[in-house]
């Protein structure tokens, strides 16, 4: 179930900062992503790219649920790569990076927008690679993860000029 609603960018930033202040110890790394990072004036939800702390994902999931419940939020859904919470009336999506060598892809995937993500997928296919929310992969068997520490790494590997988040999805702006 989606809890998306329209809110002003400034209000979304305040909610995101508050959420992060109360949950940041759950992550090794985190980045405010999505439409907030792209500086969209109207935001429908809050997206965060995160590397969960700890080796045991099930234990992390339990700890995250308790924390969010404890700060007045609630779990909307847990998935393999995206977890959603409802917090202060807004949907907060965590894009989970379960391998730090895929951090660059997770940042790009979480920041979007959808057209940018589709473009990455096309570029990867043209280069004989696979890209998804888990990382950038070779097509050999078994597939090998290609290390992407930054979004610029992803662009370099795909032969795609890096666009800052606020320019993504906007024609004629670079």
Question: Which sequence ranges carry the predicted segments?
Answer:
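Acidic, metal-coordinating catalytic segment for phosphate/diphosphate chemistry
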Residues: 3-11, 56-174
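Charged, flexible boundary elements
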Residues: 7-21
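Active-site nucleotide-donor binding segment shared across nucleotidyl transfer reactions
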Residues: 17-46, 50-57
